Amino acid sequence: MALFDGTRLAVLDTETTGLDPGQGHGLVEVACVALDGGEIGETWSTLVDPGRPIPPDAFAVHGITDRMVRDAPGPAVVAAELERRCAGRVLVFHNVAFDLPFLDAFMRSAGHGPLLHAVVDTLGLARGFFGQGGNSLGALATRFGLPAEAAHRALGDALTTARLLRVLAARWESERGVRTVAELAAASQDALRLTSRRSRVG
């Protein structure tokens, strides 16, 4: 797809101990999928020791246990690898408002700076077409018939997000005239702001 020509992206997903890094919750898994010229390339994922017990409600979502993360790489190793894999790339998330605060808190805790990259949010791209509801990653994967991956594990969700991005980008290109990844990033953020404003008014 012409929109992706010459552009390098990193599709990221996380699994966590809870919903708010400000309350001490942290990463238990992170994944990165390279997307070069629109094609899925190298993938990487790792478990992360959050330094606290994984609560039952978090385990119920992703199935990751304290025993599984016990021998995970240290934060400095994971942060350095994540920084390397994201270098020079536009970042892609499904719901950046959830993942990025966790990643930034993790990077700071490991002595690294935040991931200051342009961002495309597939949640925003979906809301731009379908409105506020029904835009979970699983629901969108079903809507578009995307291959089933390991849901609520970081690599499975990152791969699904990468495939979803290609589907949604094609629609934004053909139906809304978006021509570059920079325009796609702006469109995703604009859609998130607009739907958020409508939900507050409604």
Language-model regions, residue ranges each:
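Active-site catalytic microenvironments for nucleophilic, acid-base chemistry
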Residues: 106-109, 128, 164-171
